[in-house]
Design a protein with these regions (language model features):
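Predominantly soluble domains enriched in secretory-pathway, periplasmic, or organellar proteins
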Residues: 4, 27-392
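N-terminal secretory signal peptides that target proteins for export/translocation
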Residues: 1-11
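Bacterial N-terminal signal peptides
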Residues: 13-25
């Protein structure tokens, strides 16, 4: 009957084709890409990090966070590392490319060890299937990576040599434009975040416990020599969409003590630290919600320790704080997979993804402003170590 109808009424074919095109296009319009970088080299066995013998390739999982529930779109092999903050991934504002850095690799001289790497990989997200189109050498042990708000500049923090690499972006092509030093080689630049106007960026330094302020003018990036001192080992950092406040994690001494997150008032010139809050053992990642009303923080919570350790817990945590000016108030928290890494938000602020290295999975959480609940899980190939969405 359908075939007969189409043959006898060909004038309806354009309308049907248009309808089908609309149906297929609708999900794409709502799509939001998240990319998880997964490390296959390192596993944690009862609190001890071990190198995997003949590991499978590291890879990146591409996820549609706009789908309900979020769904995997594909996977591409790409070098990466759990060493470093969970912002080892960046996605361009137009979601055309993703960048993944690799801080460590298997030591060619001794496959039972890892050694420093220096690679940044470019993934074409519009290709079918997605593919690595370039591998670029940056500094020693690259850790964090971010696009400028206009997508024309990329900054990479290099923990291994105390520098920040500068790359120009033209379409899907990246070109190294230079490098600046922050302190000495042991300053440990960990992550970099741009302010929304693109004229400044903040860099956490877990080696000497400072936060640097960079000035940005096109591809000219300079250290202003202004710096802030928060807690011990400042690590991940996230800046609100309005550019008025930043929240960063401080990893502390790693002895099982409670650690802190810190609030920076960006309206002040120079920026100033105005508050710190105790959150538990080793806050790893911090990500603002798209509207800047909340910040989600992942807490390792002792889950990466031996089971006999007094500070051991069998789960990590995601803690969501409500932001009111420069004050943070705990809104909700949930138990998640252990050795917890990065966290991202959906555009509407109702869904979060949290990485669990111990379980090779990403927890899917729902949030309604009051309750935070795990609603599902996405299995990945390896330990999920870094995750981002496009920051628009």
């Amino acid at each position: 009957m359908i075939s007969h109808t189409w043959r006898s009424a060909p004038r309806f074919i354009p309308a049907v084709a248009l309808l089908l095109a609309t149906i297929w296009a609708a999900p794409a319009l709502q799509a939001q890409i998240a990319v998880s970088a997964n490390d296959n080299k390192v596993v944690n066995i009862d609190g001890v990090n071990r190198i995997v013998e003949n590991p499978a390739p590291d890879n990146a999982t591409i996820i549609d966070l706009g789908a309900s529930p979020p769904k995997v779109l594909g996977k591409v092999n790409v070098p990466t590392s759990v060493v470093g903050p969970p912002q080892s991934v960046a996605i361009s504002p137009d979601e055309s490319i993703a960048l993944v850095v690799a801080s460590t690799k298997i030591d060619p001289a001794d496959p039972k060890k890892t050694t420093a790497d220096n690679k940044l990989s470019v993934i074409d997200l519009k290709a079918s299937p997605p593919a690595v189109t370039a591998t670029i050498e940056v500094g020693g042990s690259p850790a964090g990576v971010s696009f400028s708000p206009d997508g024309k500049l990329v900054l990479v923090t290099n923990r291994g040599d105390g520098t920040v690499s500068i790359l120009n972006v033209a379409g899907k092509t990246l070109t190294v434009a230079g490098k600046i030093a922050l302190g000495d080689a042991k300053s440990g630049p960990s992550h970099v975040a741009f302010l929304p106007d693109g004229k400044r960026a903040l860099v956490t330094r877990d080696g000497d416990h400072r936060i640097s302020v960079l000035s940005v003018d096109g591809s000219k990036v300079e250290d202003t020599k202004q710096y802030l001192v928060a807690g011990i080992r400042p690590y991940s950092i996230s800046i609100s969409p309005k550019g008025d406040v930043a929240v960063l994690t401080n990893q502390g001494g790693g002895q099982g003590d409670t650690d802190i997150i810190t609030v920076i008032d960006l309206k002040k010139n120079p920026p100033r630290i105005v508050d710190s809050i105790s959150v538990g053992q080793i806050p790893e990642g911090a990500t603002m919600s798209p509207d800047g009303s909340y910040v989600a923080v992942t807490i390792q919570n002792g889950s990466q320790r031996p089971k006999t350790h007094q500070a051991y817990n069998d789960h990590g945590l995601v803690m969501v704080y409500r932001i009111n000016g420069t004050k943070l108030t705990l809104a909700a928290q949930a138990k998640v997979g252990g050795w917890t890494q990065g966290v991202v938000w959906s555009k509407d602020g109702k869904t979060l993804l949290s990485q669990g290295m111990l379980v090779n999975a990403i927890d899917v959480l729902s949030f309604d402003g009051k309750d935070l609940k795990v609603t599902g899980s996405i299995k990945v190939d390896g330990g999920p170590a870094g995750i981002r969405t496009a920051e628009k």
